[in-house]
């Protein structure tokens, strides 16, 4: 079967056996299931088996082709496609393709593969997230991250880089110093992430401030998320977001830079600030924390 959109079909597969019948002429009234010579139920079961993905694979290295491969692609055409394409294993295709809400089982004569059982045990979003975060495609990106001996990579701490943040890191490396400062300022204005405050009166008629997350499903791979939330649980820090230094002492945190005098902030002053402020944020500033704060 000739290649279409950089795909090739293994010899002897079900898809390959369809082509001669198409060439011989198939009437329009024949349904897809008549062409495949199987019932609708069998087609559904076959689709949900991992083996069904062996019929079509993404072209990569010709040496990786399965045995008994017979295609109409020339060697030059294959090499050209192989230089710009990558191979996606069938289990990864299954993770992104098989619907988790299907309750159909494999035929009794054939036990489902372990990978398929794991796929069906979680939701679509969980499986897609797991694939995106654990795919082998990240390995090459991870190996290509330049690192210097002084522990700084283009102005950002090397240890703050995470494997799953390399896409954003590549974008940040292209920014000029002025652009980075602008991004940092914007990030601080939007920071911290997903936090809001509300007041609650206790029996002693004292105002108690609680912090709750707006969303509960924030991905855990955001760097320093727990530290961010714990840090911003200190109420007085909301008033002086741009002047706070995490590494400084408590006294220096509340010192006015213009007069050098210590600020005597009362709980009521902090309450007025918290009462009228809802804090939303963005995760981009996380990679600035170790250097700037």
From Swiss-Prot:
The record's subcellular location field reads:
Peroxisome
Compositional bias per record (Polar residues), positions renumbered to this chain: 98-108, 260-273
* Region annotation Disordered: where it falls in the sequence: 98-121, 250-273
The UniProt keywords, alphabetically, are:
Autophagy, Peroxisome
Principal localization reads other
- What domain of life? Eukaryota
A GO-annotated cellular component: peroxisome
GO biological process terms, alphabetically, are:
mitophagy; pexophagy
Q: Does the keyword rRNA-binding apply?
A: no
Q: Which residues cross the membrane?
A: none
Function field? Required for autophagic breakdown of peroxisomes, called pexophagy, through linking peroxisomes to the autophagy apparatus. Involved in regulation of the glyoxylate cycle.
Q: How does it assemble?
A: Interacts with PEX3, ATG8 and ATG11.
Official protein name in the record: Autophagy-related protein 36
């Amino acid at each position: 079967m000739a290649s279409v959109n950089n795909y090739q079909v293994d010899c002897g597969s079900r898809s390959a056996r369809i082509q001669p019948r198409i060439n011989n002429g198939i009437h329009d009234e024949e349904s897809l299931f008549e062409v495949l010579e199987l019932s609708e139920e069998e087609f559904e079961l076959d689709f949900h088996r991992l083996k069904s993905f062996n019929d079509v694979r993404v072209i990569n290295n010709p040496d990786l082709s399965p045995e008994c491969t017979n295609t109409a692609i020339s060697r030059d055409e294959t090499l050209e496609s192989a230089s710009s394409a990558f191979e996606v294993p069938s289990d990864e295709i299954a993770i992104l393709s098989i619907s988790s809400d299907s309750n159909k089982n494999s035929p009794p004569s054939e036990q489902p593969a372990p990978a398929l059982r794991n796929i069906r045990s979680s939701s679509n979003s969980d499986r897609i997230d797991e694939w995106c975060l654990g795919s082998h495609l990240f390995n090459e990106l991870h190996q290509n991250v330049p690192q210097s001996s002084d522990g700084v990579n283009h102005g950002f701490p090397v240890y703050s880089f995470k494997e799953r943040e390399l896409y954003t890191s590549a974008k940040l490396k292209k920014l000029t110093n002025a652009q980075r400062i602008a991004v940092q300022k914007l990030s601080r204005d939007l920071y911290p992430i997903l936090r809001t405050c509300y007041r609650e009166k206790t029996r002693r008629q004292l105002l108690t401030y609680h912090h709750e997350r707006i969303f509960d499903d924030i991905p855990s791979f955001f760097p320093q998320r727990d530290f961010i939330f714990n840090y911003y649980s200190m109420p007085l820090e909301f008033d002086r977001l741009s002047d706070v230094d995490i590494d400084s002492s408590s006294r220096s945190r509340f010192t006015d830079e213009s007069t050098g005098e210590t600020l005597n902030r009362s709980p009521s002053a902090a309450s007025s600030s918290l009462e009228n402020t809802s804090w939303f944020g963005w995760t981009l500033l996380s990679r600035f924390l170790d250097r700037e704060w």
